[in-house]
Amino acid sequence: MPLAQLADPWQKMAVESPSDSAENGQQIMDEPMGEEEINPQTEEVSIKEIAITHHVKEGHEKADPSQFELLKVLGQGSFGKVFLVKKISGSDARQLYAMKVLKKATLKVRDRVRTKMERDILVEVNHPFIVKLHYAFQTEGKLYLILDFLRGGDLFTRLSKEVMFTEEDVKFYLAELALALDHLHSLGIIYRDLKPENILLDEEGHIKLTDFGLSKESIDHEKKAYSFCGTVEYMAPEVVNRRGHTQSADWWSFGVLMFEMLTGTLPFQGKDRKETMTMILKAKLGMPQFLSPEAQSLLRMLFKRNPANRLGAGPDGVEEIKRHSFFSTIDWNKLYRREIHPPFKPATGRPEDTFYFDPEFTAKTPKDSPGIPPSANAHQLFRGFSFVAITSDDESQAMQTVGVHSIVQQLHRNSIQFTDGYEVKEDIGVGSYSVCKRCIHKATNMEFAVKIIDKSKRDPTEEIEILLRYGQHPNIITLKDVYDDGKYVYVVTELMKGGELLDKILRQKFFSEREASAVLFTITKTVEYLHAQGVVHRDLKPSNILYVDESGNPESIRICDFGFAKQLRAENGLLMTPCYTANFVAPEVLKRQGYDAACDIWSLGVLLYTMLTGYTPFANGPDDTPEEILARIGSGKFSLSGGYWNSVSDTAKDLVSKMLHVDPHQRLTAALVLRHPWIVHWDQLPQYQLNRQDAPHLVKGAMAATYSALNRNQSPVLEPVGRSTLAQRRGIKKITSTAL
């Protein structure tokens, strides 16, 4: 099976040298090619002047620099800068873009040609998996390209550091990439620079192919290009020996990417550039046997040194690849329409967040002026239209040690103090390890909330990652900023001006089942979304469900406080895609995850019970002891008849009983709650006022007592280590730590 067989799925694998035989693996290479013209120093350049004309976004007016507000510097080099910009006029006002600004005077002729090429190719291209050029214009001294601002980072560095994936997951990305390449080929464009950093993720997790500076337009399939360009490890043999190459070269590079995604290593990588090129031309490569037969077959058909024999090079083009058995489960039409959910959603945060960009640039004041040429070891100008700054070797090693928490560590490199940007106001709430305060952003005078977390008491990493990854959901609290002063972490979020959901509902004199159904639908839909992503909240008490404004509309509900939330992870700490979870996760891990998800539903059942009757199911008031409350919860007994229940419909009672079932395995899942008749047929529910207990202070006290009893730090009863099924399965004699 793929990747699951490796303790570390991204460990280096031994690749045979040209002289080695491949006794342990099946050979996938055909005849070696000569190396008549290996010369990594040469590159053919067309010497010609160019004129970049304007390009205007369809349905919009002609653009110029004055229409864009500079927000941040994303990258800088000797002949230009890349800015995060906001359009300030026109029908797309407030839209964020990446603006690539090139100073004509410092552009070499070669770079001018490449800039023209980027612009011309992007004008022709309109595809869901290719970066889009929205505007192109020039002033007397500068060239401007206005492009998609892609916040997800590049596919490989993000997923290799954060996520465990399977062949099924890899298949999704390769399929989207195949459609993007085919579209370019249909326009007569050879991509030629296919490499990991040129495959970006948008905020949903779909790919975007970027950086067309090395692409070469050809008139037809027989037209060959001879320039020596691209990244050597991904080059096809015919590119290396400069005999001329066609679009078939891209399918070789496609195979290299596939091999790298499935094994974590490059198929051809020598100690230097020349040795790598020799390996590409002559080396035999053993096929990793943990790959499926379908994956091995596709790799063999892509790694043909004769480009005419390569899959995708025939008259049917990409259809040959789409028909291959490796892609048999892909619905290509649904894929093109972006109807297939990506395996992984990047932690992108707000639209204007630049967490994947180097703070060396993003901390600078944005000014549209020529950049000072960087020193020899400064960051490279751009990595394609994604503008993700390349890290130095030292930083690269540091990033590898950061591991799964790299996103948060990157956030915390901000040296600015929280109080420099915000004015702290009164307390909103106080917890055992944090305090929440109202604060005002000094630059904009806007109100926010800040959760100040004591790092000695709790690691906020998981909470911040979850908010970054899922905070764009309309009913999850939005993360605005993060600061770390060493002792405390300051998590800035939108301010919940509408207060707690239960407060508002209990104060509302007129409240019907139809309104209760709309509220529960909104919350459960959000919880279902989290559970589908492998996230459990684990603290869904009513005080963590609030309104962002005072409208009282279900759309303004926000689930807050992810301090106890968990993301499903593998033993090595990497996140797991749904496909990985289904295939390779230990039963006890899934059991725990299922239990936590069932606890989330139980909490929503308590909320529903209280909304309908005005009192809680397991506590009569704030004076009930924890023992009394826990005994009632454990018995699973609660009343659904008489008194205030007389005004409640039978379908509502049925849903409450199934959400509060004492056995978590028999409790409804979030998806089943959403399919319950009381939710589905909300428009048929009674609109008359529910007859509820009118004692909000008692309900608040009883609810607080309920969750206080549940969250008590009880001393666990420990049994002998040998009794543990996990210990028995692994043959462990001694357990050094226990996670409860």
Swiss-Prot record:
Residues 68-327, 422-679 form the Protein kinase domain. Pfam families: Pkinase (PF00069), Pkinase_C (PF00433). PROSITE patterns: AGC_KINASE_CTER, PROTEIN_KINASE_ATP, PROTEIN_KINASE_DOM, PROTEIN_KINASE_ST. Keywords: ATP-binding, Cell cycle, Cytoplasm, Disease variant, Intellectual disability, Kinase, Magnesium, Metal-binding, Nucleotide-binding, Nucleus, Phosphoprotein, Repeat, Serine/threonine-protein kinase, Stress response, Transferase. Changing Y483C: In a gastric adenocarcinoma sample; somatic mutation. Serine/threonine-protein kinase that acts downstream of ERK (MAPK1/ERK2 and MAPK3/ERK1) signaling and mediates mitogenic and stress-induced activation of the transcription factors CREB1, ETV1/ER81 and NR4A1/NUR77, regulates translation through RPS6 and EIF4B phosphorylation, and mediates cellular proliferation, survival, and differentiation by modulating mTOR signaling and repressing pro-apoptotic function of BAD and DAPK1. It is linked to Coffin-Lowry syndrome: An X-linked disorder characterized by intellectual disability associated with facial and digital dysmorphisms, progressive skeletal malformations, growth retardation, hearing deficit and paroxysmal movement disorders. Forms a complex with either MAPK1/ERK2 or MAPK3/ERK1 in quiescent cells. Transiently dissociates following mitogenic stimulation. Interacts with NFATC4, ETV1/ER81 and FGFR1. This is Ribosomal protein S6 kinase alpha-3. The gene is RPS6KA3.
